[in-house]
């Protein structure tokens, strides 16, 4: 089983989960079922992924009790604002076929719209009603976090950000540590760009592990929550087989040399897409 990270609200989240970003709806149900069978208990989806229905169906048919699964989804940009958020939440849980979420995230800050504070107030209302266990954000930069906390008085439990050895986000992780926010990594494998890197493949050979397992282990040892994605049942199981080895200090130093500081995804400060 995955180790768990205790969040600032007292809830705990499995450190390794399955992400279903860019997973076609027709593949999602099979992938989530394979993950739950392999021992995963943390599933991460989003309204924008258009696969909440299939995610929920796999959970319902898995035989795993709902209370044993940490289920995460995200509010899309066009649904920000207090009332719109309440409606979007209802739509998400209906698609998922559940009556509560373990974690709900604001997908992007969309700073141009300036609605993320009211959105988070709606999240807090839903949490107070018992419909969400933990509330958090995704792709928030330090200035967005500062505004959110100052305006609402609530520190998000999680900030899910692009994070991999090319973009280790040390500065933002330091901010999280000071504020008590858990760091969660999306694109944890660098969208596959690191799997053939000689540094990673060399470390993998030394440990008798795959490059993906080395990268996931790197996240675990940094304290990140990590949600690798795959639709291949064997790879899904392999990505979860990361708890029986440890990277050395030299391994960590070698991986640090890969940093470029370049994003593979959009810049949250300028990404204002609401389509």
UniProtKB/Swiss-Prot annotation:
Keywords for this protein: Isopeptide bond, NADP, Oxidoreductase, Ubl conjugation
Residues that bind NADPH: 189, 227, 229-231, 235, 238-239
Official protein name in the record: Aldo-keto reductase MSMEG_2408/MSMEI_2347
An MF annotation (GO) of this entry: aldo-keto reductase (NADPH) activity
EC number: 1.1.1.-
Cross-link (Isoglutamyl lysine isopeptide (Lys-Gln) (interchain with Q-Cter in protein Pup)): 262
Domain of life per record: Bacteria
Membership in a protein family: Belongs to the aldo/keto reductase family.
Active site: 49 (proton donor)
Keyword Hydrolase listed: no
Top class in the EC scheme: oxidoreductase
